[in-house]
Structure formats: structure tokens, C-alpha cells
Design a protein with these regions (language model features):
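Active-site neighborhood of phospho(di)ester-bond hydrolases with catalytic His/Asp-centered motifs
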Residues: 77-84, 111-114, 142, 178, ...
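Divalent metal-coordination and catalytic microenvironments
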Residues: 28, 48, 73, 84, ...
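Active-site microenvironment of metallo-dependent hydrolases
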Residues: 1-41, 45-46, 102-104, 289-305, ...
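Short, ordered loop/turn segments at secondary-structure junctions
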Residues: 55, 113-116, 144-146, 182, ...
């Protein structure tokens, strides 16, 4: 696939120098991600495309361009391409997201709108598509493949089969199938998943993968099934095995999970890094504003010892190859003119950002205009929760008094989203299971989608909170109302706060509502601009810390993967506790 110029014949003339180019960037050190070289060059741009790169005699033909941009000796690198991103996880609309990431040098993102798809179905994906039109960046869309993530083990607000995939495939800027996270369905050749893959193969679009800890013959089967990328690679051995087997590894640095160091440790001894890319996956507004976006991920890789040019190539050229766009991600004739001027290859703070040859950001500030628009979905209520009482949050035991053995989920590490199954012997009082210490909490996953009234209850150990109730409708991927709590009374108050505002996050301690982060769009997204949202997010983080989450860099997102039944080994859903690898529900009592 190629991004086509609007007038190829005119571009040819600009390349030959027989007509003026729109712009030339001169006095730069060009970072050539194809050869690995750095050298002085002039880059001529015509109609959003690179027409000519002059490196033999830079400075000689500047008169052949209408505008001359002095790079002041800076490095000129391609615009960054995020290999895998859920814009909803920034809690911003696509337009506000663009305002946040463009000054950081991100000119293209491959976005998977499966968060909003799980809540609003086709209407949600169309919203993400329509609201990202006409932006000074490229938001390319992968069609959500697993809505819900694992059918039969959770209830979402929609279900995508081949019919829905086919309908979305005709949208402009759709380039592939989003992360095929039901990896067992691929490995086992299940009809629902394979029908979707077969359809996308016929369309000639790429298949994005999701294969945590998948290894050996299971990995071979997954690759033979079609998906060829993975952003869920979490350790060094896994990274090396996947790249050796021809898989693209999208090393992730999100607000939740950071895997770049482990991935690089695994592959630093190989000769070719062509199958290594970078992604942010889930990065919230506060981090984007104060830390950065993909430029921060590349900085991290360099700090772990990766060669800067190789790291930049992984964030540009390699990613374009992964998504099958031939003329994106490098600075060469016929390529799209997405470029950054940076003072340092280690710091990667763009002095200027060009998108399609147009200056869109300068010195950390957006200079392109992004018009504010409103859409009907932004006013739609998605909280269809039945009337709740304290009784809904009590775990009723099979005995009135005594003890019972409970199947529970356990976190071994505050920094990891993976969990283990454990069996706890807990006391029973008045027919209800009691907690014995502050490492234990109750969990409720309350279905919030129209037509359901299911509530999954369980026990979690090592979640990190020591008191109170933490509630969120940001709860991958079905985004049901998930609550971790110490008492049913606190849980009810936290739930009511979110039902009242249309969704978001809330924290309650000793019956007092500490803070509510309102996310009225699908219970996932704020309508506030990035700076306002970041301030609100900081208040929510402080509320989380007041409940005991003090040892996490970003406590806001601790809860969001607790109900994601594709991350091993056990997770909760509105139907109960799920054995991820066996794809079956686990009884509450052992």
C-alpha cells in the first residue's frame, strides 16, 4: 500500500527541478533510517511529498523552492509512528489527543478503537473515525477484532462478527485488523475468529497480534493463523523468540505497563532490528503532557543502550513496514513529508514538526489549527446499571457461620497486570464472606450495558489498596463497572457516583467520596482539553494513593486490567472469575 500524491506528474517535475518545490529544509543533518547514515542534506517537499533529497551539493539549489526553512544544523528525522494505540485510553477525544501528541513528534498512530466498540458498537468506531478527520496528523484505524474479548466469559455492549468487520472495512483510513487478543481462538482454529481473519486476508489488510507468553508450537500456530505482531511481549526470552520467528514485536511503554527494557535486553545481541517497533498502547493525558508520547518511548530505549538511529528507525521505518505502507517512515523521494527537527538524538524534543510538509508544531506548541467539533455520541448515556443496593456487594456463603474456601485472584507485583489463582480460607459471619486483613479486598464487576443485569463477585489479594472503594468504568475490554472495595457500603457509594455522571473513576474512604474523574463519553473519555483533564487526573491519583496505592508511579490505571480475560492467568468478569488459559469460569467456592 502507498499513500498517493494528489498530482504525481507535478511531483515528478518538482523532483526534476523543472517546477518549484513548495519548501526546502536546508542546513540539517539528515538521519537516514534506511542506511543508518547521518549526513548534511537539503530536503525538497512538494504537495506533502518528498520530491528530492540533495546530499551531494547541499545549499546549491535552494532557489528551486518557494520557501526555505533553515534547520540551523539540527537533525532531521522522520515523524514518529505509534504501532499500537488506544486513543480512548488517553481519556481524550481524537481531536484533543491530536493536540497533545503532535508537539511530541507523533505524526501517525495506528489506533484500535476497541474500547469504545465494546461499549457503543459500530456507532463508537464510526465516532472515532469521523472525529479524527481533517487533523494535522494521521490516525489510521485497525478494526476491533475481539468484541467482546472472549465471548461467553463476559458480556459487553456489542459483538463484532464478520458482518460488522465487513461494514467497517470500507471506511477510509482503515488499514488492518486490530489486536487479535483471543489467541487461543486462532491457535485452535475456532470458526468465529478464523472467519474474521479469512475476510481480512481477502481484503489484503494486515493482522495485528496480541500473544502474551505464547511460545513454541503455539506461537507457530498463531503466526500461521495470520497475526504477525505483538505488543504484549513482556520478557527478554519471549522477545527474542518472537523476532526469530518473524514476528514484529512492538515494545510497549504505556501508563500501565513498561516492557521496553526487557524487550531490548532480549534482542540487543541480534544483527537486524527490522522487526522491532515501539508503541504506547495505553498512555493517559497527564503522561503525554508532562513526559511525552512516542518520543519518550524511544528515549527510554536509547537510555537502555539502544543505538539512537536504530531506535528512531524502529519508531518510524520499521513500523511503516509492519503496517504495509511502503512510502511512510523515511526521508527519501516519494515518501510522505512527515519530519521532525531535533537538537539531540537522545532527548528527541522536536523544535519543529512537519506533517505532509506543513509546519504543525514548534518548540512544544501546536501551531496548526484543530477545530473543536461536537458529535451526538458525546451526549449519549451508556450507564444502564440496574438499581443497586448494599446486598449486591455482599458475597453470600453456603454456610451461615464458620469458614469457607474461596477461589481468589492474586497479584504478585504492583507493576504487573498478570494474576494467579489462589485458594483462601475465609471466615463467614451472618452468611457473608469476611475479609481478614488489608491485603484482601472484595471485587465486583457490574454489567453496565443495556439488556444485562449481571454482577460478578470475588476476592482479590495484593491489589494494593488498603482501605476504601475504588470504582471505574474504564475496565478493559468490556468496560463494565468494576469496583475493588473493603465494605459493601463504600462500594455502593462509589458506584452511585459513576452512575450519576455517566462513568469514569471514583474513590471512597470511610463513606466519604474523595474524588470523581468524570468520563461521560462512553464512560471512557472526557470532553475536557488535555491540560484540564491532566489536572483532574492528578486529583484522582491522589485519591487512589489515599486508599493505599502509594507505591505505584501511576495508581490511576491499576484497576483497568483487573477484568481483562485475555491477560493470564485469572481475571474477573461480570460472570465471575475467569481462567484465561482454559477459557472457562472458575467457581467462587473451592
Amino acid at each position: 500500500m502507498k499513500i498517493q500524491p494528489s498530482n504525481k506528474r507535478a511531483l515528478l517535475k518538482a523532483a526534476l527541478g523543472t517546477i518549484e518545490s513548495d519548501m526546502v529544509i536546508t542546513n540539517v543533518q539528515l538521519v537516514n533510517v534506511i542506511t543508518g547514515e547521518i549526513y548534511p542534506a537539503d530536503v525538497f517537499v512538494y504537495d506533502g511529498m518528498i520530491a528530492h533529497v540533495e546530499y551531494k551539493e547541499p545549499g546549491k539549489e535552494l532557489s528551486k523552492a518557494k520557501q526555505v526553512v533553515d534547520g540551523e544544523g539540527r537533525y532531521l528525522i522522520p515523524g514518529f509512528i505509534d504501532a499500537h494505540e488506544h486513543i480512548e485510553s488517553s481519556m481524550m477525544t481524537p481531536r484533543n489527543f491530536a493536540k497533545g501528541v503532535i508537539p511530541n513528534g507523533t505524526t501517525t498512530v495506528i489506533t484500535d478503537p476497541h474500547e469504545i466498540a465494546n461499549v457503543c458498537g459500530l456507532e463508537g468506531v464510526r465516532y472515532m473515525h469521523e472525529s479524527s478527520e481533517g487533523l494535522p496528523m494521521r490516525q489510521l484505524i485497525d478494526i476491533p477484532s475481539c468484541v467482546p474479548a472472549v465471548p461467553g466469559l463476559e458480556n459487553a455492549g456489542a459483538e463484532f462478527l464478520v458482518k460488522e468487520i465487513e461494514e467497517l472495512s470500507s471506511l477510509e483510513r482503515v488499514i488492518g485488523l486490530a489486536e487479535v487478543m483471543d489467541f487461543l481462538a486462532v491457535i485452535n482454529g475456532e470458526d468465529r475468529m478464523m472467519d474474521i481473519i479469512d475476510f481480512m486476508d481477502k481484503k489484503g489488510l494486515y493482522l495485528q497480534g496480541h500473544a502474551p507468553y505464547v511460545s513454541g508450537r503455539m506461537l507457530s500456530a498463531y503466526l500461521c493463523g495470520g497475526p504477525n505482531t505483538c505488543h504484549e511481549t513482556r520478557d527478554s526470552d519471549e522477545a527474542l523468540e518472537k523476532i526469530r520467528n518473524g514476528m514484529f514485536v512492538d515494545a510497549r511503554d504505556s501508563s500501565i505497563t513498561k516492557n521496553v527494557k526487557e524487550v531490548y535486553e532480549g534482542v540487543k545481541g541480534i544483527k537486524f532490528f527490522d522487526h522491532l517497533c515501539f508503541c504506547t498502547d495505553d498512555r493517559e493525558a497527564d503522561d503525554i503532557l508532562h513526559v511525552g508520547h512516542l518520543n519518550d518511548v524511544v528515549r527510554a530505549a536509547i537510555s537502555y543502550g539502544m543505538d539512537p538511529v536504530t531506535a528512531i528507525k524502529s519508531a518510524t521505518y520499521n513500523t511503516a513496514r509492519e503496517i504495509h505502507i511502503e512510502n511512510l517512515g523515511a526521508i527519501a523521494p516519494g515518501y510522505v513529508a512527515d519530519m521532525l527537527l531535533v537538537d539531540s538524538l537522545e532527548e528527541l524534543k522536536p523544535a519543529k514538526v512537519f506533517f505532509g510538509g506543513q509546519l504543525v508544531a514548534e518548540n512544544g506548541q501546536l501551531v496548526a489549527e484543530i477545530e473543536d467539533r461536537s458529535y451526538p455520541l458525546e451526549q449519549k448515556n451508556t450507564m444502564f446499571v440496574k438499581e443497586l443496593t448494599v446486598e449486591d456487594f455482599k458475597i453470600k456463603a453456603p454456610v451461615q457461620e464458620g469458614t469457607v474456601k474461596v477461589n481468589a485472584m492474586e497479584y504478585k507485583d504492583l507493576l504487573l497486570s498478570s494474576t494467579l489463582q489462589t485458594v483462601l480460607e475465609l471466615p463467614v459471619k451472618d452468611g457473608c464472606v469476611q475479609l481478614t486483613d488489608d491485603t484482601l479486598k472484595y471485587v465486583a464487576v457490574v454489567n453496565r450495558h443495556e439488556g444485562y443485569d449481571t454482577i460478578g463477585l470475588g476476592i482479590v489479594k495484593g491489589f494494593g489498596t488498603t482501605c476504601g472503594a475504588l470504582a471505574s468504568t474504564v475496565s478493559h475490554d468490556s468496560h463494565n463497572l468494576t469496583i475493588v472495595y473493603d465494605t459493601p457500603e463504600n462500594a455502593l457509594k462509589a458506584a452511585h457516583a459513576l452512575i450519576a455522571c455517566g462513568g469514569g473513576m471514583s474513590a471512597v474512604k470511610d463513606g466519604e467520596l474523595l474524588h470523581v474523574l468524570e468520563l461521560p463519553l462512553a464512560g471512557l473519555i472526557s470532553l475536557k482539553p488535555a491540560k484540564e483533564l491532566a489536572k483532574d487526573s492528578q486529583k484522582m491519583k491522589e485519591a487512589n494513593r489515599a486508599l493505599g496505592l502509594v507505591d505505584m508511579e501511576n495508581p490511576l490505571l491499576r484497576i483497568v486490567t483487573l477484568a481483562l480475560p485475555v491477560i493470564p492467568n485469572v481475571k474477573m468478569s461480570d460472570l465471575g472469575m475467569v481462567d484465561v488459559l482454559k477459557k472457562e469460569l472458575i467457581p467462587l467456592f473451592a
